[in-house]
């Protein structure tokens, strides 16, 4: 069968128009290969068909820089969407939006390829059972439990520890559950992507993860598709290898932002705040594929940037409607030196429900939140009048709240190199038992410092015993 070849008729930024012979128009979302003129390592420039303009012309979005393209150049229709390498060969590797390795470790040796555009699983294939995914991080497991096959948003500013929590989760899932992680760097800083790769390599978790990067310097076409490339990788592990997969997306906002950049070039009328009119469809198409099926699950953690801290902005507002829970990182808590700096009162989870997590877990979690909320309410009084003016009951509440606050901190495996403290994975039942004990006053004789940066309650008791012996 002879190749279907068209010719470039127009180039506007990241958008390329190609004319094909009559009756041979490529399908929407098909990939076209153009011999790469800008002398980069990649032999072809890949473009994705976005529109049929009439007169046998298609409008495409380029997945790489379009410098050096001229009218009359040949574009070959591949007849299928962008296909990316999947499976075991992709683990421990970094690839770009079209599945080419960018880690200078040679080609990805596999015969398994999947298209990046795939339908979401049918209702009949979806698993409706709600299960909790244990992460081994106390504050997450107790107060913001992760649903298996659910979607969690990670909200936080710069430098409060989003990446460290992501890495710890990748580490814990890999070691405890033997699970596989896929990391999608969507429009993030190249430096951060580089740091993540080397940190994961040093922490020994790289062999259980596939990294797919489309950084800030990439054209919008690549940034708008790189999340789908990562998703295709994750879907293979879920559907073919029957695995439970973790999909990390940093940052989901950049996916929307890239879509809005190409939207105007495609001649679409902008909607609110200049976003693409197809915002809901674009995001829905991505999010609906992230789900649990009868074969396996994809659990997703998505970092969400909130433009100008405005949660009503269309991009974060649309993202919210898809999430099962929010993990909010707070600068105030990070300033106290409590890591992970999760805000226990601002974070929410859909499955913190007695029918899912059980009455014991639910009652402990709610009691912890009540004590912390009471402490927060009393802080103004303490600041003005001091602790002595509080009633005995309030003094006890404050003492327990401060113990709880410190016990919510935890040493991480991936941070061992710079904390010098070995990381700890805490089982959920141990977490619940320990917090129940603190609430009941079983550990009122321990000092606040005994609870800081420990894993289980046994370590806190050991600290106390050591101190007693020294005295």
Curated annotation (Swiss-Prot):
Keywords assigned by UniProt, alphabetized: ATP synthesis, ATP-binding, Cell inner membrane, Cell membrane, CF(1), Hydrogen ion transport, Ion transport, Membrane, Nucleotide-binding, Translocase, Transport
PROSITE patterns: ATPASE_ALPHA_BETA
Pfam families: ATP-synt_ab, ATP-synt_ab_N, ATP-synt_VA_C
One Gene Ontology cellular component annotation held by this UniProt entry: proton-transporting ATP synthase complex
UniProt subcellular location: Cell inner membrane
InterPro entries, sorted: AAA+_ATPase, ATP-synt_VA_C, ATP_synth_F1_bsu, ATPase_a/bsu_AS, ATPase_alpha/beta_chains, ATPase_F1/V1/A1_a/bsu_N, ATPase_F1/V1/A1_a/bsu_N_sf, ATPase_F1/V1/A1_a/bsu_nucl-bd
Gene Ontology molecular functions: ATP binding; ATP hydrolysis activity; proton-transporting ATP synthase activity, rotational mechanism
Entry EC number(s): 7.1.2.2
Mode of membrane association: Peripheral membrane protein
Alphabetical list of CDD domains matching this protein: ATP-synt_F1_beta_C (cd18110), ATP-synt_F1_beta_N (cd18115), F1-ATPase_beta_CD (cd01133)
Residue sites binding ATP per the record: 156-163
Superkingdom: Bacteria
Catalytic activity: ATP + H2O + 4 H(+)(in) = ADP + phosphate + 5 H(+)(out)
SUPFAM superfamilies: C-terminal domain of alpha and beta subunits of F1 ATP synthase (SSF47917), N-terminal domain of alpha and beta subunits of F1 ATP synthase (SSF50615), P-loop containing nucleoside triphosphate hydrolases (SSF52540)
Function: Produces ATP from ADP in the presence of a proton gradient across the membrane. The catalytic sites are hosted primarily by the beta subunits.
Assigned protein family: Belongs to the ATPase alpha/beta chains family.
Record-linked HAMAP family: ATP_synth_beta_bact
Binding partners and assembly: F-type ATPases have 2 components, CF(1) - the catalytic core - and CF(0) - the membrane proton channel. CF(1) has five subunits: alpha(3), beta(3), gamma(1), delta(1), epsilon(1). CF(0) has three main subunits: a(1), b(2) and c(9-12). The alpha and beta chains form an alternating ring which encloses part of the gamma chain. CF(1) is attached to CF(0) by a central stalk formed by the gamma and epsilon chains, while a peripheral stalk is formed by the delta and b chains.
Protein name from the UniProt record: ATP synthase subunit beta
Lineage: Bacteria, Pseudomonadati, Thermodesulfobacteriota, Desulfovibrionia, Desulfovibrionales
Gene: atpD
């Amino acid at each position: 069968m002879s190749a279907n070849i068209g010719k470039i008729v127009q180039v506007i930024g990241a958008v390329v128009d190609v004319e094909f012979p009559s009756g041979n128009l490529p399908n929407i979302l098909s990939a076209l290969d153009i011999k790469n003129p800008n002398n980069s390592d990649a032999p072809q420039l890949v473009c994705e068909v976005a529109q049929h303009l009439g007169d046998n012309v298609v409008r495409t979005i380029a997945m790489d820089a379009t410098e050096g393209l001229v009218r009359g150049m040949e574009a070959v229709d591949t007849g299928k969407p962008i296909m990316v390498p999947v499976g075991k060969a992709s683990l421990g590797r970094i690839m770009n939006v079209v599945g080419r390795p960018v880690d200078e470790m040679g080609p990805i040796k596999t015969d398994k390829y999947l298209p990046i555009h795939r339908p979401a699983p049918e209702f009949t294939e979806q698993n409706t059972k709600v299960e909790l995914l244990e992460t081994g991080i106390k504050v997450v497991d107790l107060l913001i439990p992760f649903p298996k096959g659910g979607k969690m948003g990670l909200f936080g500013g710069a430098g409060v520890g989003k990446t460290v929590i992501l890495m710890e989760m990748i580490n814990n899932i890999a070691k405890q559950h033997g699970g596989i992680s896929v990391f999608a760097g969507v429009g993030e800083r190249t430096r951060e992507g580089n740091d993540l790769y080397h940190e994961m390599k040093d922490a020994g978790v790289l062999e259980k993860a596939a990294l797919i990067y489309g950084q800030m310097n990439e054209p919008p076409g690549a940034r708008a598709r790189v999340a789908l490339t990562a998703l295709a990788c994750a879907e293979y592990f879920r559907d073919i290898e029957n695995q439970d997969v973790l999909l990390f997306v940093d940052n989901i906002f950049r996916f929307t932002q890239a879509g809005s950049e190409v939207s105007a070039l495609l001649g679409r009328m902008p909607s609110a705040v200049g976003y693409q009119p197809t915002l809901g469809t674009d995001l829905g198409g991505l999010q609906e594929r992230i789900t649990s099926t009868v074969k396996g699950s994809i659990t997703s953690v998505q970092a969400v940037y909130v433009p100008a801290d405005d949660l009503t902005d269309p991009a974060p507002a649309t993202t919210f409607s898809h999430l099962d829970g929010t993990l909010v990182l707070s600068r105030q808590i990070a300033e106290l030196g409590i890591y992970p700096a999760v805000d226990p009162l601002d974070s929410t989870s859909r499955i913190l429900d007695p029918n899912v997590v059980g009455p014991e877990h639910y009652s402990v979690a709610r009691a912890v939140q009540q004590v912390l909320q009471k402490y927060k309410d009393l802080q103004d009084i303490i600041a003005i009048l001091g602790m002595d003016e509080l009633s005995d009951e309030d003094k006890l509440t404050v003492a327990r709240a401060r113990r709880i606050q410190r016990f919510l901190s935890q040493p991480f495996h991936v941070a061992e190199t710079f904390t010098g403290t070995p990381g700890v994975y805490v089982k959920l039942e141990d977490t619940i038992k320990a917090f129940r004990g603190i609430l009941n006053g079983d550990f009122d004789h321990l000092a606040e410092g005994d609870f800081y940066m420990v894993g289980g309650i046994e370590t806190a008791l050991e600290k106390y015993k050591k101190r007693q012996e020294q005295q």
